[in-house]
Amino acid sequence: MNKSENNVAVVTGIGILSPIGNDCAEVLSSLRTLRDGIAEATKIDVSCFASHINAEVKNVDFSSRMTTEELKTFTDPYLRLAICSARDAIRNSGADVSGNDVAMVVATCNAGMNSQEAEYKSMFSDIEFSREISLQGEFYAIARTLASTLNIGGGCFVINTACSGSTAAIAISQMLINQGKYKTVLVGGADAMSIANYAGFSALKVVSSQKTAPFSTPIGMNIGEGTAFWVVENFSQAKARNANILGKVIGHATTGDAHHPTQPDPRGDGAYRTMRNALLHSGVSLDDIACINAHASGTSANDKAEAKAIAKFSQDKYIPFTSTKSYTGHCMGATGIIEATCQLLSMNDNFIPPTLHFQGVRDGCEVTPVAFSGIEKEYDCFLSANYAFAGNNAAIVIAKERFEKFETKACDTSSIAITGIGMISSLGIGTAQTVDALHSGKVGVDDVTRFECSNKAGCVKLPPLRTLNRRIDFSGMNNISVFATVAASQALDNAGIRMRRDMSEMVGLIGSVSRGSSEEAHMLGVFNDSLRRGDIGCFSNVTANSTAGWVSKALEIKGANITFTSGLNSGIQTLEYAQMLLRGNEAKYLVAFAADELYAQQMKSYSDFGYLRSDATENDFKMKYYSVYKTVFGEGSCAFMLERTDNAKERNANIFGEVLASVSTMDGGDFYNANLDSDGLCRAFEIAIMQAGISASDVDVISWSPRGTAQDSKIINLRDSLMAKVPLVTSVFHTGYAETMSSLQSLGCLLYSLKNDNGLWTQRFGIDFFDNVECKEQPKIVASLASSHTGGNYVSIIKVAD
């Protein structure tokens, strides 16, 4: 055993609202009495589909856990579920889970789909759709919601890897505790029932009209909903306050299939590697794994692949495995933590619940799950795994408090190097082309020609796709996936990394998006058709992680794999997670990308909400303080290649800069306000310079991604108060404001320009005081600063390469 008690991640509180119960006791009773929560649908009208059943959360009194004002503000059911479950977890823990020293890691698949549906329902009925409803529908809404209702101001990671998201969230909570970044983390997931989601899976013909029977018959899944949250603390803090320790998170892994946008690798390779890596990370032996909680969606392709993976993972040993989806249905982004909760409660009651409705092994499934009445057994350790659309896989290893045969890997403070940069924007395809365009004063904002839109934007002009990179198969990709794949491949090439099959597991992928690809075709199919016929091709790309799935497949990247949807300007957060993975030795190389795509319905809604400039300032995009929202949007992708600096030097790589520190914080406040307060940004900056071992006066230049509105004043004020006359550098006023990737692109352009001795390009701020500030001849330290009205603040400190 090699562990530091301070940094062991322990579970001290659980809150759950699920189809089989709304607290731990009720859930355990359902597991014990073999009572599933699958029944006739009551929350949505499914009469036009082949299946009329689902698994719903029932009998929740939101008013007992939420104030009158909160009930008025948060109307989307998934946000209400999240608030109540999180509060239950905090109450169950007894910990003080508030303030700036607490982090959040939250996952969702569909986010506020019920709110998103209103946008399309309003086209065909009198349903109201407003900015307030739209904000609740965004992937990142859950972060601001919990920050404002729970008063949490630490770092916040919003994960969207579809059905594996909350398992990956638990993995990150372990990293944050193990690496000493936080002593308390609130982790969870939430998704609510929605007609658009039900229609999508029905169109794929994977929804069963009978109760799901994983690894057996009938074939098919049942759609579920729900939420679960855990309070995770470091061991010493929990013991010091005499907390009831419910379990330990001792291992984790994420991987990518690199196989198909929706279907799993039929060999079960990705699932096997994920379980294997989680076991290796925990340091326990296969003999210590007493049970596997399988993903077991009930679909033909998933169950066959997972059965192969379990057989390979188990080797010649018998490891009981079960599926709690047979109780709860498939609860989308919350399914991982709901299933882990079910298994943790069962382990603490010395019980392995059975896979319900089992009628014998299905053809093609090589192993038999625990069935019928379950197993009465005292055990100390289990593995829980989930596998999702886009080949996103995640697994965790959970143990009882008394279990000691594990290792908490030591985390070092190694420097992390940026060794490759790739990008695609309205200025061109490639970093060199974009930077050259910046230095020549070119502006990429123009009339929109790809779709109907009366406003201007910085749209990418794609040539025939085969001319972009003849090694890549772009077949089936949407625009955002093309953008990200091009940028990621350029970053690899720029770093001198030529992907080979034998190194695919050494390379990880971190994505950041604010939304998925255009959902118009699917949503219009659902709400402009009485039969609710969704669009199969579009539906598979609506999930935010589909972009990373396409990149993974195109470039054969099979290592650690995650997608963040933390909010506007959050592309720079990928550097924070990259630093955690590399310092934890969970990857050798990492591609970190951010991507955005503009589409017609998005621009129409933004116009309705007053987000678009429509006067003379649209034609000459510069800073204007007359609004907190109005901007000129752009699109594209930027990707960085990262590795440990010692590894980069060993292979004589070209180093653009070293990540000294990367920090995020969260602002709560009024959910609908513009977040003009600078407290969270200032806190992030202070923490970052402390971690980097520098002072504010050491910063030579600031990279930022302004929206071009009053919101940007907090970064200007921070500069003026601590770093007077330091240049502010951005590509935004040349390219248009891309919601997620502009923060990463501005930094990438700056580092590339400095590396090639091109200095700074002339800024288009529109105020001489900012446009013509002189910079040191050779800047040494760059501060990348980002913030937005969605509550997130992101700061990275970069040492410029010599």
Regions found by a protein language model. Give the residues of each.
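Condensing-enzyme catalytic core mediating Claisen C-C bond formation in acyl metabolism
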Residues: 7-14, 32-42, 50-52, 207, ...
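Conserved beta-ketoacyl condensing-enzyme motif
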Residues: 10-11, 35-160, 190-198, 286-304, ...
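Conserved small-residue
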Residues: 11-13, 31, 86, 104, ...
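Short acidic, glycine/serine/threonine-rich loops at helix termini
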Residues: 21-22, 115-119, 170, 195-200, ...
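Internal metal/ion-chelating core segments
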Residues: 159-232, 238, 565-635, 642
